[in-house]
C-alpha cells in the first residue's frame, strides 16, 4: 500500500532524526474517537502538531491522511512514522488489542472511557469484566492513567488489576458521584 510502505532497513533510517513522541492511548466502549479529536484540538491550540488514528481516519495536524477504521496497530504505526507528528493520539480498539496486542510498548498516558455490553463472544470475551480487563491493558504500559471511576465494572476491575500488580496504584480517580 503506497500510504503505508514496509518498514525501512536499518541503513535507510535517518537515526539522528529519530526521537520519542509523547503518546496517549485512548480506549473504551464509547467515546474513543471523540476523545482523540478533543485532545488533538487541545494540542493544536498549544501549537503542537498532533497525529491521531481512530475508527474514522488518520489525521496529521489538519491533514486527513486516510479514511476508514485505523484504530489498530496499523493506524498507530502510520501516525508514529509521520515526521510531522509532535504528539500521538492513538485510539486503541478492543479487537486490535485482542488480535495483535498493543501497538506500542510504552505510552505517556492512557485513557479508558467506559465499558459496555458489546462484542460478547468475540476473541474469548464473554462478559463486562472481560471487556474491562481488555481495555485496562493500556494501563500496563502508561506512565499516567485516566480511568472513568463512575463506570462501576471498570472501577472494580481496575482495583483487581492493581491488587495483582498489573497496574500501578492510581491515586487520583475522578468520581463525581461521591
Where do the model's predicted regions map?
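Flexible active-site lid/hinge loop adjacent to a nucleotide/diphosphate
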Residues: 64-149, 154-155
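Alpha-helical transmembrane segments and their juxtamembrane interfaces
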Residues: 101, 124, 158-162, 169-172
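Short hydrophobic/aromatic-enriched beta-strand-loop microsegments
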Residues: 109-113, 165-171
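Alpha-helix boundary/capping motif
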Residues: 151-153, 160-163, 172-177
Amino acid at each position: 500500500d503506497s500510504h503505508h510502505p514496509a518498514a525501512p532497513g536499518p541503513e535507510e533510517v535517518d537515526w539522528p532524526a529519530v526521537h520519542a513522541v509523547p503518546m496517549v492511548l485512548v480506549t473504551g466502549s464509547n467515546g474513543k474517537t471523540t476523545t482523540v479529536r478533543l485532545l488533538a484540538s487541545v494540542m493544536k491550540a498549544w501549537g503542537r502538531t498532533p497525529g491521531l488514528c481512530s475508527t474514522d481516519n488518520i489525521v496529521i495536524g489538519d491533514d486527513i491522511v486516510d479514511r476508514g477504521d485505523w484504530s489498530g496497530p496499523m493506524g498507530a504505526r502510520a501516525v508514529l512514522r509521520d515526521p510531522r507528528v509532535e504528539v500521538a493520539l492513538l485510539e486503541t480498539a478492543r479487537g486490535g488489542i485482542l488480535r495483535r496486542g498493543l501497538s506500542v510498548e510504552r505510552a505517556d498516558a492512557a485513557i479508558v472511557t467506559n465499558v459496555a455490553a458489546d462484542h460478547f463472544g468475540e476473541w474469548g470475551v464473554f462478559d463486562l469484566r472481560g471487556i474491562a480487563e481488555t481495555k485496562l491493558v493500556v494501563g500496563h504500559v502508561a506512565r499516567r492513567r485516566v480511568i472513568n471511576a463512575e463506570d462501576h465494572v471498570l472501577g472494580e476491575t481496575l482495583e483487581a488489576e492493581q491488587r495483582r500488580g498489573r497496574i500501578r496504584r492510581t491515586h487520583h480517580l475522578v468520581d463525581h458521584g461521591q
